[in-house]
Amino acid sequence: MLDLLNKLNDEQIKPVMDTEGAVLVIAGAGSGKTRVLTSRIAHLVEDLNVDPYNILAITFTNKAADEMKERLEKIIGDISQMWVCTIHSMCVKILRKYAERLDYKKDFSIYSETDKDKVLKRIIIGLGLESDKYLKTSKNLISSLKNKDMSTEQFARENPRMRDVTSYMKIIDEYNAELFRSNAMDFDDLLIKTYHLLAEQRDVLLALSKRFRYIHVDEFQDTNFVQYNIVKLLSYANGNLFVVGDDDQSIYGWRGADINNILDFEHDFKGAKTYKLERNYRSTKKILEFANTIIANNTLRKDKVLWTDNDEGVKPELFVANEESGEAQYTALQIKTFVQQRGYKYSDFAVLMRINALSRSYEQEFMKYGIPCKVYGGFKFFERKEIKDITAYLRILCNPLDNEAVLRVINVPKRGIGDKSIEQLVYYSEKNGLSVFDGVFDCDNLDLNAGAKAKIRGFKDIISKLIVAKETMPLLELVKEVIAKTNFMSCFEEDTPENDDKKKNVNEFLSSVEEFARLNPESPLSEYLNSITLSSDTDEINEGEFVTLATIHSVKGLEYRCVFLCGLDAEIFPMQRALEEDTEEEERRLMYVAITRARERLFFTRARSRFLYGGRRATEPSKFLTELSDKLGIVKKSEQRYEQGGYSSDRSSYGNYGGTGSHSGAGGYGSSDFGYKNSGYGGNYGSSDSDYGYSKSYGGYKNNSYATGYAVQTSKPTEKIHSSDLGKFHTGTNVRHKKFGDGVIISTKNNGGEIIADVAFKGVGIKSLVLRLAPLEVID
């Protein structure tokens, strides 16, 4: 045990040795709280001869529980009698033993979220209601009421003006009755029924609280009302409760977590002792300076200041793009530079965002530059249901023979076209050798009643008009027309956070269309669909070696060498909804969590304009950026537009599509706004592919000399394509490249006399090539 203590600092040793009574450890980010927890348990067993049977350690993820078990087994050996588990697992153990006290059988089922959905849908339909309208709110209410230990009667009394409150209460009561009849519990039942068991069955309370002489709780700031009271009851007999948490990392209020559980701990447990772990082992001094500055603006917190003996480090930087595509491209190019020139691995990087809708532009840019990435905190953008639904409509307009697309959206939004009607439609189409869409046009011949036929005919009329519109409407206007004519947004009428996210995803999809149409003004809908299909089908290049794209919530507890925190615009972070609901402090805690994920480098990014609410609009900086810049100042890196030689879009201001090269400082990243004063971005990185016609050098500078546009060596290109042969290369042409292999041209454009082709290569991604220089050949 002495060896273990030697690995702890003075701040950590004190709570480890304080074993009696209630103890609160305020553990700042990266302060070694897991080591403190395991060391304390080891001290109890090894030095104080406490039986592992009498120790309980509660975590809030299975991964954390497994890691703690592994550490403890290495230190003290057999821990089979010790309970080290999540709070839900603990409740299952208790309920299995005492199930009959609650009129359940001990082999009760535990319903998953999918099981819960099926039960609720059946009940809602049985009550003559629409499942799509009531399902999500019913689920949320069930969880909320159970975690607050509130009856439906009490909720109805307190919310008399809530729309359809009576219907919701009927659904919830019937749901709970159905679970009981089925001898089943859902996840929230595991908590609330354990709480009632302990609170109402004194002999059970005494038996369990006497057994667990020493109780440990990790991530205490994330406990809700029921969880907190379970822990409090279990400590009844001995009072030895050791909790570890950080009020500054309480970010799950929307899920029921109550920050007051940790803030009021000393009040609730008289005589409780509090220790602070403020030494950070993760981040540089500069990063911690930003973390301390941002969180100091909160009022609901215990005072603490993180410090470290780590290096001073590089001051975090802010990059301001003209629009979201530039924000993503800047990040991609920075990552490429760090990997190719500074010895970083892709797994060293995380791109963090407040909402997962922002991942779309990053997924596209990363694919383009061959950067492997994995999306957490949501599905990949083009794989999300609402996006797949919209693209299915667009696929039908381009290819009415696409049966899968027709079947996907024939009843989206709900049109009353039921399963039986669809089965009859498919049967008729197959029997007569027709596509499903042809079957839709023959709906009068289907073996259905007049009402069912009329609904299918309505779908046919919508699609027919959109097919006509496709021939004359510009791309962006056409997509907006599809959304309007299909009444697509009615899918998200219910006011829920989930629907808010889906609306934002639809808006982000429109941004993708707008960007494509602007950069490819002559390209039809089919080419746009090709571009996003390639994006959707691209998986990680090297498993385990990828950039993390994630919401901030999903990376809590993790760390990375380099973090890009994107979308720092007003209304996005902090979210407008949070400001309206007076939860700004939780948003600021989320900002703090994001900052403290970074070990060495931290970048903030935002865009001066975004495609929001159906159109492009100017944005304002996040108030969090203002709070940081007012006190610390932020090194600002701002892209600039071309003044000559090419497009004036975000993409061309990176020199992505070539150009003539300029030394005026008007392009590339511009002046000292790039941030690498000792290395030319058009140097080593660009020249490495100079023989392949790849416009990979994106302007930049070296020693205050600036370059825009195409900066690779061009004096002796290998295997040039003769100008007379350029006509062979057009959208849809299959080609072979000397380095990148086989691919297909997905778009071409004329930039200052140079023909630039975007080519999607198998296993590589999309590359922008100067056709005059690229060693390409047409293949069959």
Region locations from a protein language model:
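A basic/glycine-biased coupling hinge at the interface between accessory DNA-binding modules
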Residues: L2, E20-V23, G28-S31, A42-Y214, ...
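Conserved Walker B
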Residues: A29, F212-T223, Q227, D247-D248, ...
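Short glycine-/polar-rich loops that comprise or flank the Walker A/P-loop
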Residues: G21, V50-N54, S80-Q81, K116, ...
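Conserved helicase C-terminal RecA-like lobe
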Residues: R161, S359-I371, R384, T391-I634, ...
